[in-house]
Amino acid sequence: GIDRSDPETWDDDRWPTAVHGGILPSHGIGHSAAQWYIRDRAPVKQAFAAIWQDEDLLTSFDGVALWRPWTRHGHWRTNNGPSWMHIDQHPIGRPGKHCVQGLVNLLTTSPACGGNVMVPGSHKRFAAIPELYPERLARIHPSIDHFRFPNDDELLAGTEPIICHLEAGDLLLWDSRTIHCSSPGLETPSFNDQLFRAISLVCMMPKSKSNDKVIAKRRAAVENLVSTTNWSDRFINADEFPNVVEASKVTTFKLPPVPELNKNQTELVG
């Protein structure tokens, strides 16, 4: 297995399936004790409740992002920021404000290690995207909430992206219409025996945005250790991502135990 204190155990054969940006979305991670602990922290729920002006929330069953030190193995380096600037909301399928995403930062960031990159104010130009990319959007089903921008996109011109410096324990929230990504730093870290980045992904949305059918699936997901995306008003199974399915054909991962939830956590399930 993987030993946090021994980088020799972080090899590709043992490391869980990762998707863009070093996100580990599946294999039961969404129901690990660590993820449920973070969702149960009062300040996390209070932040989302303040945004939505609603205390009755549903949590995502999101995973985490862990960056292995690419000073150790170059192919561990994650996507450079300009290569995958994106939004996580379909401009036609979901116009307007629908979701505020979040993460709890677990390791203090640095210019060398990198982190989240945001284009300030870009959510205000979200409504213009269908006119700029009618052909591309026509090929993307309205239920697919991931849209990438080319490096020379006019929506990226004139506004300097910012990289978010976060202390351990900080909560970062952003509107899903915001153009963003994550990126390694511009400098070379001086160490190769520690994780460069560790975050817990968390998103909470009002229960009123969902429905009984989705909530029934969510309850079953807890028992079956099924992780999801950030959209807690719908049910999107992260274990069905194509690269996760392919990895599961050749590798068996030990899943965490079924969580024993307290009252607050159970309410966040629905």
Description of each model-found segment:
Residues 53, 86-99, 159-160, 166, ...:
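A short beta-loop-beta micro-motif enriched in histidine and acidic residues
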Residues 96-99, 109-181:
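Double-stranded beta-helix
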Residues 62-64, 102-104, 200-204:
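A structural signal for short, well-ordered beta-strand segments
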